[in-house]
Amino acid sequence: MSSLLNIENLNVRFNLRYQKFHAVKDVNFKINSNEIVGLVGESGSGKSVTAMSIMRLLPEPKASFDKNSKIIFDGEEILSANKKSLRNKRGSKISMIFQEPMTSLNPFHQVGRQIQEAIFTHQSLTKEVSKQKAIELMELVEIQNAHNKFNSYPHQLSGGQRQRIMIA
């Protein structure tokens, strides 16, 4: 079985004004299709930096990767991928659920519309069909009364509901 995600020799440094900080050192792992994996470690151990590296969300050049670092997702080398290719993958093939969804959800937009926008952006669906799909996804992650919650703002939901919205 070929791996969906292959991390080899991941080394991430933050280039600060007067020094370089080595945030992630020699991380290696593989994840196969349909495999569920948790990234566990102490606070400050590099879990978030590793995840953000996989998504290529770190601010470059302030964050840099060693030359021998490799992140291969679905056969494509992520560290050398162009922005358009990355944009097409994010949200449709790969995504990240942040610990605190309030920092990821726009507080000025209804949660259902935020899901709908992601669907509309990545799939060729009408607004009405993408709205229905958003409601179905909310139901799939067990948001009670999803049709009405579609119009809720993030602050109107519990922390667990906000995390499930991000999963949807």
Where are these regions (language model features)?
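ABC transporter nucleotide-binding domains
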Residues: 1-168
